[in-house]
Amino acid sequence: MDMRVFGSRRYGFVPGPAAGGHRDDLLVWLHGSTQSATVTRRFTNRRFEHLGMSVAYPEGVARHWNDGRRLLQEKTRELGTNDVEYLTEFVHSFECTGRMFGAGFSNGGHMIYRLLHEAPGLFDAALVIAATQPTPENFLPTPPTADRWRPTPLLLIHGESDPIAPIAGGTVRGGTQSAQATADYYRRLNGDAAPVRLVTLPNTGHVVPGPGCVTSEFLGPANESVDAAKLFGQFIDELPR
């Protein structure tokens, strides 16, 4: 992985292969809380680099993204970091000739939700793992109007034994909805224009499922039998180009 700089921040970049159906595509992976580009690459076991596309690993300020939750007691919120603007400029800097995909885990997943609302059309499809939509009173973006919403294919993956972000919803830096309510919310916004798919995994914790899945007692059960990267690859392959 090459470490590069955009603006005042580092990011990791792994170029895709010279040939193949996804050679012109780019995946922007947003890490979870306290992670860096290097840490999140290990945490995902580099699985998304097997999709045959380039992968970029940007870093949040103080290892957090200023996501859309109203309650976020982290330095990036204290500083008023504008990650919507930063990530929009970051994505456009690549001048991608293929499709642009966004994916995030936990805090990174919440940042994806914010981008879907405040930077509509930035991604051609998105993936969120281990994060559910905040409750309305805990969500900073204003409800989207029809002319401000861009239907975006969305794959949601959530562990049924996640101790950090419960699948039934609860309090995770403020109120959060269930995984099912999250899927229903985005289906209402997308209508028939773009699919929303929810995959729930039994005996799976706050992890990125896949071979070599990294976990701990704090994060809950690992899942090496389901490959989140492969699921996303199958999801985007079903989309019309």
Residue ranges of predicted features:
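Conserved alpha/beta-hydrolase "nucleophile elbow" surrounding the catalytic nucleophile
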Residues: G104-S106
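Conserved hydrolase catalytic core segment
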Residues: R114-D124, P134
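Hydrophobic/aromatic beta-strand patches that form the interior of the parallel beta-sheet core
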Residues: V28, A56, F101, L127, ...
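C-terminal catalytic histidine-bearing segment of alpha/beta-hydrolase fold enzymes
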Residues: L155-I157, G175-Q177, D184-R241
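Active-site rim elements
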Residues: Q73-E78, I164-Q177, S216-E224
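Serine-hydrolase catalytic machinery in alpha/beta-hydrolase-like enzymes
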Residues: R4-F101, H110-R114, E118, P209-F218
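The feature captures the conserved acid-bearing segment of alpha/beta-hydrolase catalytic domains
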Residues: A125-A194, N203
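Short beta-to-alpha linker loops that shape the active-site pocket of alpha/beta-hydrolase fold enzymes
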Residues: E59-R63, T132, T204
